[in-house]
A protein has these predicted regions:
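Bacterial N-terminal signal peptides
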Residues: 12-22
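Structural motif
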Residues: 50, 125-126
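N-terminal helix-cap/turn-to-beta initiation motif at the start of protein domains
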Residues: 23-36
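Residue-level recognition of beta-strand termini and adjacent short loop/turns
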Residues: 100, 126-128
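Edge beta-strand at a domain terminus
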Residues: 137-159
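Low-complexity, intrinsically disordered Gly/Pro/Thr-rich segments
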Residues: 128-136
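Bacterial N-terminal signal peptides that target proteins for export
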Residues: 2-14
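Central antiparallel beta-sheet cores of small beta-barrel/beta-sandwich binding domains
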Residues: 34, 39-119
Length: 159
């Protein structure tokens, strides 16, 4: 009799724990990833809603100036007419559309470090962590970037 209750209690506790895990993962992934996100502690991007999609612009750079003290420009852009744009304030993510719960697909990411525009998909893995798959053509040949959200980020005017 006690053994039966013990097993029943363990099963109930395991079921409750499983429901809590499922509820937590759904609540984390149903959030919209608007806010400030850090890429590799070098770039902060503000992700925002734009015409029903997600976009992102650079709001902070670890090194916003050239060694000569000039603002960093988009010098590697394949379009010569855009090479004088400042990196600070530059929109580098656009077109991300909501897909399955917690996923955004169909977006583009412009990387000013190489002047290439990539396809991007994103998934909010926790309320403070986003995984972005960056690729050209097929996702399997791309790279994954982990972004960290921190609403308390303090910027010292480096952008």
């Amino acid at each position: 009799m006690f053994r039966s209750r013990s097993i029943s209690l363990k099963l109930s506790m395991m079921g409750a724990a499983l429901l809590l895990i499922i509820w937590h993962s759904r609540s984390a992934s149903s959030e919209v990833p608007e806010g400030t996100w850090m890429f590799a502690n070098r770039v902060a991007v503000q992700v925002f809603e734009c015409s029903g999609q997600l976009c992102g612009r650079i709001i902070w750079l670890l090194r916003p100036r050239t060694p000569a003290g000039q603002p960093d420009l988009d010098t590697l852009n394949p379009d010569p007419s855009l090479r004088q744009r400042h990196l600070c304030g530059l929109t580098i993510i656009w077109g991300l559309q909501p897909g399955a719960q917690g996923h955004w697909t169909g977006g583009s990411l412009y990387d000013p470090q190489d002047g290439v525009t990539y396809d991007v998909e994103a998934e909010l893995t926790t309320p403070t962590t986003m995984s972005a798959r960056v690729y050209r053509g097929t996702p399997i040949l791309g790279r994954t970037e982990i972004l960290i959200r921190d609403p308390q980020l303090s910027f010292d005017g480096r952008c």
